[in-house]
Amino acid sequence: MLLTLFAFVVALGLLIAVHEWGHYRMAVARGVRVLRFSIGFGKTLVRWKPARQRPGQDTEFVIGAIPFGGYVKMLDERDAPVAEEDRHQAFNTQPLASRALIVAAGPVANLVLAVLLYALVNWIGVQEPRALLSPPVAGSLADKA
């Protein structure tokens, strides 16, 4: 029971991390400043800022106590005022196509993960037990055949 619950939480965490990573990577690729990448909600368990990030990025990475969700917080004028020199990095000032790509990148990342896992399972294969037949019982119809 506990092992099943642990496996569920790990699998869900993987799905959430891949989904949010899709949003994050596309936002960075489109030139949007990502303020926070969070897996989980609630109390912060782990927080770090990598020393090496792309110019203009100062992303804080967080793992929260409740692993049932995540988010990528981007620079956005709807949340707080944005300095004029940073407006080009705000999510809401991006062209519609860029915003659509960023929004779609999460589900696409999950789809790619599903295809890769499906291919991996089929490549490795699934071991099935062999059928073992004992000799027919003496005097049975199968024995007489």
Task: Please place each PLM-identified region on the residue numbering.
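Terminal peptide-recognition signature
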Residues: 19, 63, 106, 142-145
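Small-residue-rich helix-interface/hinge motifs
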Residues: 3-86
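C-terminal recognition in membrane/secretory proteostasis and scaffolding
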Residues: 1-5, 121-124
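Hydrophobic side chains within alpha-helical segments
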Residues: 22-26, 102, 109, 113
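PDZ peptide-recognition modules
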Residues: 78-97, 109-145
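Residue-level signature of transmembrane alpha-helical entry/exit and packing/kink sites
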Residues: 4-8, 94-103, 110
